[in-house]
């Protein structure tokens, strides 16, 4: 040990260059060999083997049973071999020397499993364990399934033994099946005709299907409904229904089943009768066929003529034949023309009288008048008027329900259309005026001049016959007052209607229904009155002699002709 230590120490110092080594002193020695140092450094690693560890094999020796007898009883008992420890890995020689058969290994494993299972109560141990693994849970589940299967098998065996026992001792007594009484079908047909359900008449009984109904309750319920049955017939029904139950009692389930059977029988009988009627009708038609053929054959036949016949002349007009719908339309037009020739009123009034059924309210009647516009717009306008009328009725109901102080007249003015007013002039119907327009063509003239024009030249001649009036002298002030009055008269005489007053719904921007659940929305107004308001900053606030003096971030206005003061920085 000391020699090795000295050699190692000298070698280490020689590497560091602190002292000369023995190898360097030796003249015969070669140059420094690094292999020795590397071998010395990796000496401890070479001792270990970098291979996977060998698999360990556990062998459990089971003791022999006592009842087994030795094969050679005369031979001397040998000492039992020493048990091999369970965690000792066998060498290759031992494995080769002791070959083991597969059957013996399986028998040993089965024996070991039995011993482990009989070691203790596995179910109790697993149930008392605080946390179990998935494999343990699987074993516990298998134990529970085995126990449940054993209990079911034991119950089945007991039932079979119970059922088989009485059969050997006594014979089964045959049960009598009572015939269905005809009164039952009478009762069900009566209830079906009155649209009464059999389960509804027993209102005092509970709703369960297996609820029992006593004899007294059944009889009182049938009498309360008024079924035309005698007491004996009701008793027959009770006896029959009670015989269907287990304990000679009537249940709701029995009533439902019997009623269902009766309804199915009724359907089958109705189908059978309908089939019989169809067969009879078909048989009658088949019998009538040959009789008709015999009558036709019995009719006298006309003698055949060999002469040529004259072709029939086509008296119809050379035109396309009309269909039934076209012929009906032509007839309608013809009748309408004949009616128009006989009438003495205009066509608009006639259509109004024909198409309308008046309700008595003038506003409703004028709103529901058919439009006088021709074309596709007519149908569109009529549909919008009907829709607006329904909206008016809904608004009126809502106002009444919410107690809003909106009268019916206000809603009529706001929602209903005033109607196309028919205007006559010289026994002629004038066209409808446009918004802001006038009914007549005399727009600028006063009413007196218009009357003179309408009266014609005869009345104007009468005015010429009158003597001319004398001219009256007037002062300047009187003349000024007279002209002022004429201006007022002329302005008042002219028709000054607001351009928005014609349209329906021109008050919708002012009239709003206040409902607690509906928010007001001005965008829903169909028509709105546009009024031009004055500008926010009119020119009167800034006269011409006030101008901006500086052009910076702000602008100030000042009087430019005022005295100016200049400062020199």
Swiss-Prot record:
Q: Which domain of life is it from?
A: Eukaryota
Q: Which InterPro entries match?
A: EF-hand-dom_pair (IPR011992), EF_hand_dom (IPR002048), EFC12 (IPR042847)
* Polar residues bias spans: 148-159
Protein name per Swiss-Prot or TrEMBL: EF-hand calcium-binding domain-containing protein 12
**What is the source species?**
Macaca fascicularis (Crab-eating macaque)
UniProt binding sites for Ca(2+): 210, 212, 217
The alphabetized UniProt keywords are:
Calcium, Metal-binding
Q: Where is this region: Disordered?
A: 63-85, 147-172
GO terms (molecular function) for this protein are: calcium ion binding
Determine if Calcium is one of this entry's keywords. yes
Lineage here is: Eukaryota, Metazoa, Chordata, Craniata, Vertebrata
| Domain spans labelled EF-hand | 193-228
